[in-house]
Amino acid sequence: MNNKTIGIIGVGNVGSTLAFILATNNICSNILLKDIKNNISEAMALDISQAMQETNSNTKITACLNNEDFKDCDIIIITAGIARKPNMSRDDLLITNAKIVASVMNDISKNNPNAIIIIISNPLDSMVYTALKSSNYPKNKILGMAGTLDSARMSYFIAEKLGFPNVNIKTSVIGGHGDSMVPLIDFSTVDGKKLNEVLSKEDIDDIVIKTKNGGGQIVKLLETGSAYYAPAYSTIAMIEAILNDTKKCFACATILNGEYGYKDIVSGVPVILGKDGVEKIIELEISDFEKEQFSNSINSVKESINILENNFFN
């Protein structure tokens, strides 16, 4: 077990699931929970602590009331934000959650300027941008969990097409966390073979569509919520890479500085994760078609950022 402390701000379905996995798997020494509803964080801390009595975990989990309590966290996960409500426009949701994330980042900056920040709040790419712009944090220390989840969903749909065989599936998805994401077919393999060697074009096209709609499908089925197990596990993979300084490659939302031909825009791209957060952005040689799709994805994120610049930061 790492002698590390992880803070989770926002203890809804994703935050509480994440805390449960961290605690019961002995991934860190301490977990701090904070929610706008204090009773929620207290309840989750108690419930998870009691569940741990049936495990070999020694992790301590604590509900926090004060932002100062996060001063010693090595990693802070931000899941705070509201879901879109009936009659609420996407612009209203964007501004509302930007206010929440900016407020959280202001508190973190005052109390812990050294932690690695992982954003899960939606709209993801815009919230990563908000966190960066509203704080004095180094760019490599703020990243978003998105592409890792999208890649996991793509892997699932490939396995589904193949009948769930015991094979090694690797996938890569770049771009914004939404309908404009770009699943990279040429960089996705099954036991080292390219997808078009094991699946038909029709099957691959279907996988791309299902990957883009993966989150929406779950929202539709749940009716009053969204996915939380897969997002939590994707975040766990990122946390372990940072805590253990593995230098493994993950698709994460980060701010670009000339990579792929774009600057000062947040998008999901392959990165090397280690103890310092985003240690390197990997530029893949993508096709002209994928470049066009990536450009469309970037423009979609830019639209949201322009709304923030004109109605929130201005």
Swiss-Prot record:
Residues the record marks as active site: 177 (proton acceptor)
EC number(s) given by UniProt: 1.1.1.37
Keywords: NAD, Oxidoreductase, Tricarboxylic acid cycle
Binding-site residues, substrate: 84, 90, 122, 153
Pfam families in UniProt: Ldh_1_C, Ldh_1_N
Amino-acid positions noted as binding NAD(+) in the UniProt annotation, renumbered to this chain: 9-15, 97, 120-122
Keyword Metal-binding: no
SUPFAM superfamilies: LDH C-terminal domain-like, NAD(P)-binding Rossmann-fold domains
Known catalytic reactions: (S)-malate + NAD(+) = oxaloacetate + NADH + H(+)
A molecular-function term among this protein's GO annotations: L-malate dehydrogenase (NAD+) activity
Superkingdom as given in the UniProt entry: Bacteria
GO biological process: carboxylic acid metabolic process; tricarboxylic acid cycle
UniProt key word Oxidoreductase: yes
GO cellular component, one term: cytoplasm
General function of this protein: Catalyzes the reversible oxidation of malate to oxaloacetate.
PANTHER family: MALATE AND LACTATE DEHYDROGENASE, MALATE DEHYDROGENASE, MITOCHONDRIAL
Family membership noted in the UniProt record: Belongs to the LDH/MDH superfamily.
Protein name: Malate dehydrogenase
UniProt source species: Aliarcobacter butzleri (strain RM4018) (Arcobacter butzleri)
Upper classification of the organism: Bacteria, Pseudomonadati, Campylobacterota, Epsilonproteobacteria, Campylobacterales
Gene: mdh
